[in-house]
């Protein structure tokens, strides 16, 4: 009367079979039912435990091989660091001819002394070259990315030259070299010399003016006394 409402066997292992689970209503509640009690058509005639076979032996061998390879690499690196072994250089995949062509493409003009690089989307027929500033050159040497796209106005042909000249002037102003320092010193010396000359000329002019100016009239004391006596006599 007070029996369990659930079906199935709750006894030992000898009373349980997966064949009974296939027809059970609660089949999906059994753990591992998809492998031990398969029902679908795609599961018939297939090895459902293929991923777990031949794994124990291969795992040990691969682990040992991996450790041996790591030890060998560490030993080679140590020997190369101590100088007992030459470091193997990896091939770049470029032949001498290809290297010469790349150098010709990326070479700068000898007149302007500016390095040039190929822009993105350029081909061998129409090569788009962009002038690099000194800061961009230093960044390229360090391996940093360089922005090579610049705005171009096709309607005015002379604008590109004007922009390039402005950039060169701004670079020269920002990064003055030893020649510019010398020029500025010379200009300062010239200005000082001119100021000193002007001061000397002004001093000379003042001295000449003071020497040429008429002396003030000085009345003698005798003449003044005589005039006073005459006035007294007339009175």
From Swiss-Prot:
<feature type="compositionally biased region" description="Low complexity">
    <location>
        <begin position="116"/>
        <end position="129"/>
    </location>
</feature>
<feature type="compositionally biased region" description="Basic residues">
    <location>
        <begin position="182"/>
        <end position="201"/>
    </location>
</feature>
<feature type="compositionally biased region" description="Basic and acidic residues">
    <location>
        <begin position="169"/>
        <end position="181"/>
    </location>
</feature>
<feature type="modified residue" description="Phosphoserine">
    <location>
        <position position="126"/>
    </location>
</feature>
<feature type="cross-link" description="Glycyl lysine isopeptide (Lys-Gly) (interchain with G-Cter in SUMO2)">
    <location>
        <position position="104"/>
    </location>
</feature>
<feature type="region of interest" description="Disordered">
    <location>
        <begin position="1"/>
        <end position="21"/>
    </location>
</feature>
<protein>
    <recommendedName>
        <fullName>Multiple myeloma tumor-associated protein 2 homolog</fullName>
    </recommendedName>
</protein>
<feature type="region of interest" description="Disordered">
    <location>
        <begin position="147"/>
        <end position="235"/>
    </location>
</feature>
<feature type="region of interest" description="Disordered">
    <location>
        <begin position="106"/>
        <end position="129"/>
    </location>
</feature>
<feature type="cross-link" description="Glycyl lysine isopeptide (Lys-Gly) (interchain with G-Cter in SUMO2)">
    <location>
        <position position="112"/>
    </location>
</feature>
<feature type="modified residue" description="Phosphoserine">
    <location>
        <position position="122"/>
    </location>
</feature>
<keyword id="KW-1017">Isopeptide bond</keyword>
<dbReference type="InterPro" id="IPR019315">
    <property type="entry name" value="MMTA2_N"/>
</dbReference>
<feature type="compositionally biased region" description="Gly residues">
    <location>
        <begin position="1"/>
        <end position="11"/>
    </location>
</feature>
<keyword id="KW-0597">Phosphoprotein</keyword>
<dbReference type="Pfam" id="PF10159">
    <property type="entry name" value="MMtag"/>
</dbReference>
<dbReference type="InterPro" id="IPR039207">
    <property type="entry name" value="MMTAG2-like"/>
</dbReference>
<feature type="cross-link" description="Glycyl lysine isopeptide (Lys-Gly) (interchain with G-Cter in SUMO2)">
    <location>
        <position position="22"/>
    </location>
</feature>
<keyword id="KW-0832">Ubl conjugation</keyword>
<feature type="compositionally biased region" description="Basic and acidic residues">
    <location>
        <begin position="106"/>
        <end position="115"/>
    </location>
</feature>
């Amino acid at each position: 009367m007070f029996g369990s409402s659930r079906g199935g066997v709750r006894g030992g292992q000898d009373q349980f079979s997966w064949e009974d689970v296939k027809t059970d209503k609660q089949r999906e509640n059994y753990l591992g039912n998809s492998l031990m009690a398969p029902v679908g058509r795609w599961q018939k005639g297939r090895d459902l435990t293929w991923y777990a076979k031949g794994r124990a032996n291969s795992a040990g061998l691969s682990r040992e091989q991996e450790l041996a390879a790591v030890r060998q690499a560490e030993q080679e690196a140590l020997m190369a660091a101590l100088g007992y072994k030459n470091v193997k250089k990896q091939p770049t995949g470029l032949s001498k001819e290809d290297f010469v062509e790349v150098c010709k493409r990326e070479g700068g003009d000898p007149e302007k002394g500016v390095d040039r690089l190929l822009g993105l989307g350029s081909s061998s027929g129409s090569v788009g070259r962009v002038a690099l500033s000194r800061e961009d050159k230093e960044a390229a040497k360090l391996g940093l990315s360089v922005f090579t796209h610049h705005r171009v106005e096709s309607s005015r042909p002379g604008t590109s030259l004007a922009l390039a000249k402005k950039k060169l002037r701004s670079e020269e102003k920002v990064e003055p070299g030893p020649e510019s320092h010398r020029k500025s010193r010379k200009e300062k010396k010239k200005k000082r010399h001119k100021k000193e000359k002007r001061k000397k000329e002004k001093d000379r002019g003042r001295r000449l003016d003071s020497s040429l100016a008429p002396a003030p009239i000085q009345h003698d004391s005798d003449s003044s006394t005589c005039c006073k006596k005459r006035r007294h006599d007339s009175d």
